[in-house]
Amino acid sequence: MYAKGGKGSAVPSDSQAREKLALYVYEYLLHIGAQKSAQTFLSEIRWEKNITLGEPPGFLHSWWCVFWDLYCAAPDRREACEHSGEAKAFQDYSAAAAPSPVMGSMAPGDTMAAGSMAAGFFQGPPGSQPSPHNPNAPMMGPHGQPFMSPRFPGGPRPTLRMPSQPPAGLPGSQPLLPGAMEPSPRAQGHPSMGGPMQRVTPPRGMASVGPQSYGGGMRPPPNSLAGPGLPAMNMGPGVRGPWASPSGNSIPYSSSSPGSYTGPPGGGGPPGTPIMPSPGDSTNSSENMYTIMNPIGQGAGRANFPLGPGPEGPMAAMSAMEPHHVNGSLGSGDMDGLPKSSPGAVAGLSNAPGTPRDDGEMAAAGTFLHPFPSESYSPGMTMSV
């Protein structure tokens, strides 16, 4: 019962326990009338200390009666043995308070709420999350916010983000990929930019679509998240979103927070609808694709691309975009003036308007996440925001 140390050593309480037991046995023998047996017992164990007897029936007898009552009240023995109601209630309470065998066998990491995302899916900067090996650590989201399951009401909407990716738009967040947002030393910028343009190399996935994905200086408009009441991705030509301004002609872009660029922030359709072009729309995997494009409107020349939100709000830029095919073709927009020197960048968009996507070239554009299996786009499907 007690752990033993080396040979001959014992727990200090063992000697006291033996003395107490011998005293209670002697006391029990005296209380039941076995005086000769009690004296013989003391002489055989060589008891030399003074003995103080307790009140009858003695501790040993009282302890045994309580133990036996509880023993008989156990669920598997209560039908065959007599027991008191107190013992039965004690056994029932102990059984109800005992941990479930199923829950007791689960690891600490397996007790997450149903529907919750993995911890790496909301990974913040290093040091902002507890270690996954600490079973006593509370379930916290990025930057110390309490984690809530997206399945329950009031919980945050799960943003569309790559695993192990920091939340975009937050101070201290790491870039999407090493060197993904660094300025290209060979990029000389668009003629209308007035300065060098930063290279945006999308990773193997799509940027997040959520309230945290807007960089500093940009504010998402009301109802900008994908959800009920917003226009779908496959709106017909001429249909524009409720926030579009009739005179804006720029695509908002913010470089103040690494990893905060989300493409044209005109999110529509149900959650999970991709905004970025499909991966199979490229014919040359060695060309660079710069996400700041030049849309051509009716009679419009080369558009201006300010580096911040325009005077008409960040969403005013979407009104100048003419319907583009969802498969990635840019209409009559040109991509001249952009260097094509980085072989590791994303393939350029060079298909003509309405060109069917060649599924055989899916492997060439490996820098985009493949579209969801349940979605299939045809060249006739257009998007206008």
Swiss-Prot record:
The modification Phosphothreonine is found at T355. GO terms for cellular component: nucleus. Keywords: Acetylation, DNA-binding, Nucleus, Phosphoprotein. The modification N-acetylmethionine is found at M1. It is found in: Nucleus. GO terms for biological process: positive regulation of transcription by RNA polymerase II. The modification Phosphoserine is found at S341. Residues 17-49 form the LisH domain. Its main location: nucleus. Residues 267-277 have a biased composition (Pro residues). Disulfide bonds: none annotated. GO terms for molecular function: single-stranded DNA binding. Residues 122-287, 331-363 are annotated as: Disordered. Coiled coil: none annotated. Pfam families: SSDP. Residues 245-263 have a biased composition (Low complexity). It comes from the Eukaryota. PANTHER family: SINGLE STRANDED DNA BINDING PROTEIN (PTHR12610), SINGLE-STRANDED DNA-BINDING PROTEIN 4 (PTHR12610:SF30). This is Single-stranded DNA-binding protein 4. The lineage of its organism: Eukaryota, Metazoa, Chordata, Craniata, Vertebrata.
